[in-house]
Curated annotation (Swiss-Prot):
SMART domains: PDZ. The keyword Nucleotide-binding does not apply. GO terms for biological process: division septum assembly. InterPro entries: PDZ, PDZ_6, PDZ_sf. It comes from Lacticaseibacillus paracasei. Pfam families: PDZ_6 (PF17820). This is Probable cell division topological determinant MinJ. The gene is minJ.
């Protein structure tokens, strides 16, 4: 048991190393796949690795500061539950990761009793609320377009379409106050100050998923009202539970119920269709845009369909390339956006490299 505790409640323990390894693997796998399918990596510098560290560290410092200043102690059972749930979620992060399950940690205190247990349960609700509010902020202000990657899919009729994948994890190391009696004689990285013991806890925020029904960055952004609302509700509940006498059972069940409401909302949201990108007979369909290229300067987006280039109609990459050669230092496009609107776009082209527009098209059609 002591070894399990030491592995789980340690900012640089099992959760950290597994998350770091997965983040590196996600990033390298993404660039390798893009080079195989599209002949280039859309984002070759692996920005998701740097963000794993610095964004998570900032978030961890802010949340820890609130918990320490407020002297909001958490039970050891809740800490173990949070770390254990994080570890389980990591095992499934290849397919999907979303920290909706944080509220389930409240159930770890079932069987406890007394005023101290009630305070710990209320404090846990506040902690989970803060983490969900942070997740809402990350989703709302995300720059997921920098790590969004198109994935080619085929239906039963062999028609090609594009899904969009986003894999971004944030390591959030927390320093949390725990009652001294909870951690005595346990192998923890802990510091005791004035009857409070501060213990390190590794958590993860972020998202990993693939969707054929929307851009990945906008799909993640749509989750922020859910997380923001749930986080606000839990913080208010935790404050009320600390100042009023509420049954312990309510404080144990309420965060778990909110977690289930969250995941139900995400399942419903995931079934909504906002964008479908399929290979078309007319025009050339974009499924990605390389940053800092003429395509990016023109504001092109996945789902846009190029109908004409330099006043020549185009229906495939060969026709697009030939049209670019008509005016090798400038590019004028007529395109239909994903919302159906027609617009014109134009920009200068890199001198001596008219083929490097930065458009990612369906395989064998990259320009």
């Amino acid at each position: 048991m002591a070894v399990v505790v030491a592995l789980l409640i340690n900012p640089v323990g099992l959760v950290f190393w597994l998350a770091l390894g997965l983040t590196i693997w996600f990033a390298v796998n993404r660039t390798d796949r893009e080079r195989r399918r599209y002949l280039r990596a859309i984002h070759p510098k692996h920005p998701e690795i740097g963000r794993f560290f610095w964004i998570g560290l900032v978030v961890g410092a802010l949340v820890s500061l609130v918990m320490v200043i407020g002297r909001l102690q958490i039970s050891l059972a809740a800490l173990l539950a949070l770390s254990g749930l994080t570890l389980v979620a990591l095992l499934f992060s290849k397919w999907r990761f979303s920290p909706w399950w944080l509220g389930l940690a409240s159930l770890a205190a079932v069987g406890q009793s007394g005023l101290l247990a009630e305070q710990h349960a209320a404090n846990l609700a506040i902690l989970v609320g803060l983490l969900w509010l942070t997740q809402a902020g990350l989703a709302r202000f995300n720059r997921g377009d920098e790590i969004e990657s198109p994935v080619i899919q085929q239906d039963r009729r062999q028609r090609q379409s594009a899904a969009f994948e986003l894999r971004q994890l944030f390591w959030v190391p927390l320093i949390l106050p725990v009652a001294v009696e909870n951690v005595s004689n346990l192998p923890l990285l802990a510091v005791t100050v004035q009857s409070l013991t501060f213990v390190g806890l590794p958590l993860l925020l972020g998202a990993t998923f693939m969707t054929p029904r929307d851009r990945a960055q906008t799909a993640w952004r749509r989750s922020w009202p859910w997380y923001g609302g749930a986080g606000g509700v839990l913080i208010v509940y935790g404050i009320v539970a600390r100042t009023m006498t509420l049954p312990l059972l309510v404080s144990l069940v309420f965060p778990a119920v909110v977690s289930l409401v969250l995941v139900g909302g995400f399942i419903w949201q995931g079934r909504q269709v906002h964008l479908t990108v399929t290979l078309a007979d007319q025009g050339v369909v974009l499924i990605g845009v390389v940053p800092h290229t003429p395509a990016a300067e023109m504001g092109l987006q996945p789902g846009d369909r190029v109908l004409a280039c330099n006043h020549h109609s185009v229906n495939n990459s060969r026709e697009l390339y030939d049209a670019i050669q008509k005016e090798p230092t400038y590019c004028r496009l007529r395109l239909r956006q994903a919302d159906g609107e027609l617009r014109l776009a134009e920009t200068a082209i890199f001198a001596g490299a008219p083929h490097e527009l930065g458009m990612i098209l369906f395989p064998e059609e990259t320009a």
